[in-house]
Amino acid sequence: MKAIIITIGDEILLGQILDTNSQYISRQLTRLGAEVADILSIADQREEIWQWVDYAMKQAELIIVTGGLGPTKDDVTKKVLAEYFDTRL
């Protein structure tokens, strides 16, 4: 199974925090027999989230999105994913 991990957060891109989630998730997926095809770190921006989720949907059977769910107004991940998948979260 081909997997893509998407980590969302300006803090990661700015080097303010370390992305340990992707490292852990990748190790576990590999242990379970999945092929991690890509690990993406992207900004907390609607267009970027939409673009990379759309890319991942066309490339992988499993997509894991982590981050982008903090209390600040720039954390729009939940809203964008609900719109993308045309559902409530």
Predicted regions and their residues:
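Non-catalytic beta/alpha edge segments that cap or flank active sites
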Residues: 1-89
